[in-house]
Regions:
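Active-site and donor-binding regions of nucleotide-sugar-utilizing enzymes
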Residues: 17-217, 235, 239-241, 254, ...
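Conserved catalytic-core segment of nucleotide-activated headgroup transferases in glycan assembly
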Residues: 63-77, 217-289
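Nucleotide-activated donor-binding/catalytic signature segment of Leloir-type glycosyltransferases, i.e.
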Residues: 96, 100-105, 274-307
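Structural alpha-helical scaffold elements that stabilize or flank donor/cofactor-binding regions
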Residues: 119-121, 174, 227, 316, ...
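Acidic donor-binding loop of glycosyltransferase active sites
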Residues: 123-127, 298-331
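Hydrophobic beta-strand scaffold residues
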Residues: 148-150, 259, 282, 346
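Catalytic binding pocket for nucleotide-activated donors in carbohydrate/polymer assembly enzymes
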Residues: 178, 194, 313-399
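C-terminal alpha-helical cap of glycosyltransferases
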Residues: 404-419
Length: 419
């Protein structure tokens, strides 16, 4: 199995290099991984010559948000701790490469035994934390061989994963690298127990702690508050074109509704296409922000605010009466907890099966799934007209977040007591 895995890694790398010839995004990924070890060596020599106290590895932005509460907890207790943060995805690295609580931020290099050994030689981490889905066999094998304390946090497992297949022995073995696996639910714990992995704790998802921290910061924009006034306000987070195909018709038919749209991608082509579909006055975030970052007055005729910048969405959900979260017609929905923490009902597309919080909130009545334009129209019309329905859904969403706080504290106490 291991030779097959390594061959697969090599083929994936080759495919990425071929794709990079025509895609700037893939080219960024390939170049970032190619220079990762050299960059790590240079930055470590400069900022952490004695190595790193903690190495956190995440796939992309979503997993970074799961690691972030733990990093912040560590740094608040030990400001001098050196933290290495690695990303697999360019979308995560490019946004968070200057994350102020990390001593060094780099890509994870291609997962070969040679690269894994060299990374550990350079970084010399004293504690390793992987997040959710990241299972790189060569890297985990090297960590285990060196007896470096390693932990997996916010993990979730499903019966269809390779760990639970007859041919998944090498992947099952890699799980033994982790001294403790912190899972989100009982089903994950039971699946692991069935394959002999018992160093497992149910702690839930650290993202609940993260979104609660954001909410408590109470970042506000008075100009937006004045603009929305008493109007029903819909916020659409991480919007993709397939989402827009279904909800824009409703938006155009309701000029009385104030709408905030944060596209997942906002290059010139994407923004131009979105503007053309909106049959209502709209303004870009960058057109109303001052040099010091404050929002100026929003033109009175504006019905839609398009957020074409990173880092604002989580705070803007506080102004919503209802939220649509995108991604449900693609690879999967984006972060719904960021909205639910404000006590706001969340609506999303059908590709949500891998997200425990989506299943929980649908069952409880704090979130709703839609497939067609008629579905979304029916839901939004009811939320606008039935105050009891909207109030119940809102309360349910907020209460769900509060009921699931605390994973970060448990994990922090464990890994620091074992350090």
């Amino acid at each position: 199995m291991k030779p097959v895995y390594t061959a697969g890694i090599k083929l994936y790398g080759l495919g990425a290099r071929v794709a990079a010839l025509r895609s700037a995004k893939v080219r960024d990924f390939v170049n970032g991984r190619r220079r990762a070890l050299r960059q790590l060596e240079e930055l470590t020599a400069k900022h952490a010559p004695d190595g790193y106290d903690y190495w956190f590895h995440v796939a992309s932005l979503g997993e970074f948000e799961q690691a972030r509460p733990l990093i912040e907890k560590i740094k608040s207790h030990n400001p001098e701790a050196n933290v290495l943060l690695t990303f697999f995805s360019p979308s995560g690295y490019n946004v968070r490469k200057k994350y102020e609580l990390a001593t060094t931020v780099t890509y994870l290099p291609e997962d070969t035994k040679k690269n894994a050994g060299r990374l550990l030689d350079i970084a010399r981490p004293r504690c390793v934390v992987f997040v959710k889905y990241e299972f790189w066999l060569n890297m985990l094998e090297c960590i285990r061989e060196r007896n470096i304390p390693a932990y997996l946090i916010s993990a979730i497992f499903r019966p269809g994963q390779i760990f639970f297949k007859p041919w998944g022995g090498q992947f099952r073995e890699c799980l033994r690298t982790f001294r403790t696996i912190y899972v989100q639910d009982e089903k994950s714990r039971d699946l692991l127990a069935d394959i002999g992995i018992t160093d497992v704790k149910i702690t839930g998802d650290t993202r609940f702690d993260r979104v609660h921290d954001i909410m408590r910061q109470q970042i506000s924009y008075p100009a937006i508050e004045s603009w929305r006034a008493d109007a029903f306000t819909l916020v659409v987070g991480s919007s993709w074109q397939p989402d827009e195909d279904r909800y824009i018709g409703w938006i155009n038919a309701h000029p009385e509704v104030k709408v905030i749209i944060a596209p997942h991608e906002f290059d010139h082509h994407r923004l131009t296409a979105l503007h053309k579909r909106l049959d209502r006055p709209s303004v870009l975030w960058t057109d109303i922000v001052s040099e010091n970052g404050d929002i100026t007055d929003i033109p009175t005729d504006t019905q839609t605010l398009i957020v074409n910048t990173f880092g604002k969405l989580a705070s803007l959900y506080r102004y919503a009466d209802a939220v649509i979260v995108g991604g449900g017609f693609g690879t999967g929905i984006h972060n719904i907890n960021e909205a639910a923490v404000y006590g706001v009902p969340v609506i999303f597309g059908p590709n949500n099966r891998k997200f425990k919080e989506a299943a929980d909130l649908k069952k409880l009545g704090g979130a709703f799934e839609y497939t067609t334009s008629d579905d979304i129209a029916t839901l939004l019309n009811r939320m606008m007209s039935d105050t009891a329905f909207l109030s119940a859904a809102s309360s349910t969403a907020g209460r769900y977040i509060c009921d699931n706080l605390g994973a970060t504290d448990v994990i922090f106490k464990d890994i620091t007591s074992q350090a």
